[in-house]
Amino acid sequence: APSLVGSEMCIRDRPLIHLDTSHSLEEGTEMSRLNCRDPDAAVRMGKSLRKIRREKDSIGSVVELLILGLPIGVGEPWFDGLEPSLARALMAIPGARAIEFSNGIEASRMRGSENNDMWAPGDVAPELEGAKTGDADGALGGRSTGAPLRVLVHFKPPSSLPREQFTLHLPSNKKQSLKVGGRHDPVIGPRAAPVVEAVAM
């Protein structure tokens, strides 16, 4: 049966498939607070977010989703394919601005010989070389390949800031100062991670 390894905040240098996902994140740690499995990245992100909060600003974020155990052939070609269906659902999450599958944007900078996944004989069924290391594409042509399906969901910075901004006051048709009160999250990603996971299920 397919398993959802989870969705976590990520920094691109260490994909989720290369991290230990066998246990829950320890409560009260930076890793738990930020939904980040990479201990080094969690420390760096924590420092960055404290700085952003002091500056009364916000920052964009990326949530990584990893789905394991999909058999070959799940999905449909064209509009009902695995990637279009997931992208449509994930883009409905407030603040989502872009979706990447597998190599994502990086694939646009590659040659076909670099990006193509090679099929090889497997124990039960054919498998893509690189499936175990996370280098193979989890979906091709709208259908699953049997390899892990890696999805990156990019979120914009939260727009409500505790610093002064300007907006148009419609009745007067003039720019006016706007300062939003209350509590402000400087980033969407940590709270969006469980939402990304729920949408993918």
Feature map (PLM): residue ranges:
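Catalytic-loop motifs flanking and including active-site residues across diverse enzymes
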Residues: 7, 86, 144-147, 194-196, ...
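Long, well-ordered alpha-helical segments
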Residues: 7-15, 157-164, 201
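Glycine-rich, mobile lid/loop segments that gate access to catalytic sites or pores
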Residues: 7-78
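Short, mixed-charge aromatic SLiMs
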Residues: 15-24, 112-115, 173-178
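Glycine-rich anion/phosphate-binding loop at the beta-strand->alpha-helix junction
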Residues: 45, 55-175
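Internal helix-turn-beta structural module
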Residues: 160-201
